[in-house]
């Protein structure tokens, strides 16, 4: 694992399909990819296996509705190391998406979120065993994620997302 420094703010821009079109130097450094390898690659090139598909399903649903989305994310650098971020993703007026990421400042909340993700990954594994396709697994994972968030006392993902915004 390598740490994102408190002063490091980084971004990427993608097209409507999630293919990276722009990235800043901090993103390049943390991901340990060359800029040329990132541009034109799907953003999930940095997806860590500890991230449930349900989290991304929820994100894409929000984005397709024109809403921004915020969440804690575990990313996988090219060298196999992990780096954790708080990501805010928003639709851009002319198409595509902007993802701005920073160091998770609320470590206790981050740890709870990652426990929820762990439970969601287990849930998704069971759904996958039932021969569900990738989209069905992600949709079920998203529903499971929302159930756990409601059990934690939040009425919706939007309420939860607002509560975990870094202050």
Where are these regions (language model features)?
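Sensory/regulatory domains in signal-transduction proteins
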Residues: 1-122
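Sensory coupling linkers of modular signal transduction proteins
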Residues: 94-166
